[in-house]
């Protein structure tokens, strides 16, 4: 199955590098108990309005750039999206305990709070650059959602996030349809895990809005060689509806700049989701290049057309909207 376009991969690869630097810089190699988190007086996620956010994406790989970036986010965003990979070994036995991974994640969340930012969490068991792979599984672990170790660590990590950070919105995997396409024999195992963990979350935090994200362009069979013979622009609704009735909102990612110029985007490319569900919708990841990259032609006007399409087609029911980057990276 084909992966996402090179520009998207480049942006996400650098974002992952930045996240690793942030974890290392903020934690200073220490582990210890996670202290209680300050609550925002008026959290954006409780406003009842569409909220806007970004991935953490400082322009330079320096601590000063990270600190400055969070200050900028505090001015321009309502929230930051944290999409950490699961620290498998730290959580296979229990949700409780102390570890460097817990401290690292908590320090990032604290920095967000200090800058007046709400946060949304997405639990991510897979490789962000290749959704056919698990990320950093311990040696000897079977890469399958049927594996009891995988299921235990996934569950315990998710419950730790719920108990520690109390997020209003919580995702239980990203772009999961790409994994389901690659490993249809394992799809039912993830679906059952999702339903199990959803139930556990609701017992502890019934107001938490739980979802899983779907790669919209792939769901619409727009990738050449990755459609498995399915018709373009005919969404694979069965992949979303396998998670019902336990989707509190329908959430997508989309990078359409390599499929069609912004001006030629179908008028109902996104809005067709509104006709399929009465639930709120959200964009958990996305972007559109403003210049030609790797053989893909794009302009600032195309980027504006993409933003306008999201706004006009989904705006009436949009719970939150994440654009991948607040700023370009300084690659020097």
Where are these regions (language model features)?
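Ser/Thr-rich, Proline-interspersed low-complexity disordered segments
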Residues: 19-46
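Substrate-binding cleft of secreted/luminal carbohydrate-active enzymes
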Residues: 282-332
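Aromatic- and acid-rich polysaccharide-binding/catalytic face
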Residues: 82-84, 165-168, 172-174, 214, ...
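Active-site groove signature of glycoside hydrolases
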Residues: 157-187, 211-213
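Aromatic-lined carbohydrate-recognition surfaces of secreted/lumenal glycan-active proteins
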Residues: 172-174, 193-232, 280-291, 318-326
């Amino acid at each position: 199955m084909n992966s996402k376009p090179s520009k998207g991969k480049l942006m996400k690869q650098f974002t992952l590098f930045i996240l690793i630097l942030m974890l290392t810089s903020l934690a200073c190699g220490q582990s210890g108990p996670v202290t209680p988190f300050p609550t925002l007086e008026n959290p954006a996620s409780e406003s009842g309005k569409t909220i806007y956010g970004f991935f953490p994406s400082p322009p330079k790989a320096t601590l000063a750039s990270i600190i400055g970036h969070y200050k900028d986010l505090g001015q321009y965003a309502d929230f930051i999206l944290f999409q950490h990979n699961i620290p498998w070994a730290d959580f296979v036995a229990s949700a409780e305990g102390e570890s460097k991974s817990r401290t690292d994640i908590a320090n990032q969340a604290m920095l967000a709070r200090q800058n007046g930012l709400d946060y949304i969490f997405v639990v991510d068991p897979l490789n962000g650059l290749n959704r056919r792979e698990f990320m950093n599984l311990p040696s000897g672990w079977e890469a399958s959602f049927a594996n009891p170790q995988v299921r235990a660590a996934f569950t315990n990590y998710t419950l730790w996030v719920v108990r520690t950070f109390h997020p209003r919105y919580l995702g239980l995997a990203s772009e999961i349809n790409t994994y389901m396409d690659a490993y249809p024999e394992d799809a039912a195992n993830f679906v059952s895990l999702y339903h199990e963990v959803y139930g556990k979350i609701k017992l502890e935090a019934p107001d938490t809005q739980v979802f899983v994200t779907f790669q919209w362009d792939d769901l619409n069979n727009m990738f050449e060689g990755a459609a498995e013979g399915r018709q373009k622009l005919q969404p694979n609704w069965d992949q979303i509806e396998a998670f019902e009735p336990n989707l509190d909102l329908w959430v997508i990612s989309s990078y359409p700049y390599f499929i069609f110029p912004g001006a030629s985007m179908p008028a109902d490319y996104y809005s067709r989701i509104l006709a399929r569900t009465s639930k709120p919708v959200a964009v958990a990841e996305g972007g559109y290049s403003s210049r030609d990259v790797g053989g893909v032609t794009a302009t600032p006007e195309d980027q504006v057309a993409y933003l306008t399409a999201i706004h006009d087609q989904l705006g009436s029911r949009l719970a939150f909207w994440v654009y991948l980057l607040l700023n370009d990276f300084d690659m020097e």
